[in-house]
Swiss-Prot record:
Gene: pqqA
Entry function: Required for coenzyme pyrroloquinoline quinone (PQQ) biosynthesis. PQQ is probably formed by cross-linking a specific glutamate to a specific tyrosine residue and excising these residues from the peptide.
Cross-link Pyrroloquinoline quinone (Glu-Tyr): where in chain: 16-20
Presence of the UniProt keyword Coiled coil in the record: no
Name of the featured protein: Coenzyme PQQ synthesis protein A
Source organism, top-level taxon: Bacteria
Pfam families: PqqA
GO BP annotation list: pyrroloquinoline quinone biosynthetic process
UniProt similarity note: Belongs to the PqqA family.
UniProt keyword annotations, A-Z: PQQ biosynthesis
HAMAP family: PQQ_syn_PqqA
């Protein structure tokens, strides 16, 4: 990904994606 924000943003997105797939 090409995020210019701090690393915690990428970590949060990864968490969001994980929860998204987990709730499918």
């Amino acid at each position: 990904m090409a995020w210019t924000k701090p690393a915690y943003t990428d970590l949060r997105i990864g968490f969001e994606v994980t929860m998204y797939f987990a709730s499918r």
